[in-house]
Amino acid sequence: MAQSQEKPDVEQGGLERKMETRHLTMISLGGVIGTGLFLSSGYTIHQAGPLGAIIAYAIGSLLVYFIMLSLGELSVAMPYAGSFHLYAKRFIGPGTAFTIAVLYWLNWAVALASEFTAAGLLMQRWFPHSPAWIWSAAFIVVVFLLNILSVRLYGESEFWFASIKVFAIIAFIVIGLLAMFGAIPIAGYDHAPMFENFYSDGWLPNGVLPIFSTLLTVVFAFSGTEVVGVAAGETKDPSKAIPKAVHTTVLRLAIFFIGSIAVMAALIPWRKSGVDTSPFVLVFQSIGMPFAGDIMNFVVLTAVLSAANSGLYVCSRMVWSLAQEGMIPRKLAKTNFHGVPVFAVMFSMAGSLLALLSSVVAASTVYLALVAVSGLATLVVWASVSVCHLRFRHQWLAQGHTVGELKYRAPGYPFVPIVAIVMCVGALVLVICDPSQRSTLLYMIPFVALCYTGYYASVAWRAKRHGGQDDAQNALQSVPQDVSQPHREDGQED
């Protein structure tokens, strides 16, 4: 039996296939390249040392590559919008599917709130006497309009937002390399720095342990690449676009992140790196670039808006997908004539605004708990993707299909998903071992238990209310027996 049939322009449920490979690639890059690279990378260098930071980011890149390979195979075989929890529904269980969707939605809703706050603060560099909340409100309106009007507009806006960040990184790497090899003078050196900072205090000045202690920060810095899977259901010709986006995205991320870290580490003594000043600004100022602070403020502002743009998109598609499955009110799955799930967008924006409000009125209680829970969501999603990949391939072969029938097959199976699962579990172990991160589990475990309890209680209540299984329960439990069958949001098989 053939794999999922791809409709050229319309996805089941009213969404439209309007995004192309360039949109997918830039959306994935835009979801990752943000304040983690522009601001927090200095912390990694300071803790792990120059070589240690590169090793940590190389390990993170490898994990991302493995996750994206698995996601690529799943997304081509089953190009669903809001894919993660639908894969979990098919190959793990409906309760897990619901929990994953809620965690991932919460992760981006909280991130969205923090991005709006950051945008307002960044604008105060140029307008110091204006209230930050005015700028935050303006950016909220802009991001909302970009998402509510059409998916094509979202894709185009994210393409250009991400392009600015990519251009800034390329310029940084090129200028940094010229300074490293003496083509451009740089303050603090009367000779070409080359790789002097890498070995002047020893290859690993703080030892091996900091590589692993910073690895968790690095892994979270790469979160957002999986947005490709969320957008699969709105992509033209996913069997061609998704594999291309997967490989180009991972390659560019590795070059951008590791290349940037290498340049920073070569030009900035590791003891001077930190989170107080962006390492990008330090390098640009060292070579005498005028308005370095303003230029990077603009780039970081663009990064923040890009992350907010992607955040609202991801949140709304998760809500739309949950509604299509009957897990939450189906009204939230309604789309307008442009194929945009307007109620899902509004619901997600409202959720992020509540998170933003909690950061003001309950920063040490409610908001702290939200941040703690959302912080581990990426690892949970990544691990679930790898588990689903293993089970998908097993069922595919068990049902008489061959690997050759797959339109895209991830290389290195089953090594790739197994190693990815081990790495995700290892990252969770690091959380337990790190006293500063351990408290996140105190919030995470009860929240996950609450999601499972709430889901099964809801199913039982609806079944009792209707005197049997209602459509929500059917939608969650009627998984197609043949994994090659197209998914139907009404819970029925074709």
Predicted segment positions?
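Membrane-interface "cap" regions at the ends of multi-pass membrane proteins
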Residues: 1-42, 46-51, 65-69, 81, ...
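Helix-loop-helix junctions that connect adjacent transmembrane segments
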Residues: 3, 9-15, 54, 127-131, ...
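Hydrophobic transmembrane alpha-helices that form the core helical bundles
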Residues: 55-56, 65-148, 153, 173, ...
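TM-loop-TM module centered on a large, flexible mid-protein loop between adjacent transmembrane helices
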Residues: 86-88, 93, 125, 201, ...
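Membrane-interface loop-to-helix entry segments
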Residues: 120, 133-190, 222-223, 246-250, ...
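C-terminal membrane-solvent junction of multi-pass transporters and transport-like membrane proteins
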Residues: 160-161, 331-342, 382-434, 461, ...
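A generic transmembrane alpha-helix motif of multi-pass inner-membrane proteins
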Residues: 180, 366-369, 373-381, 410-494
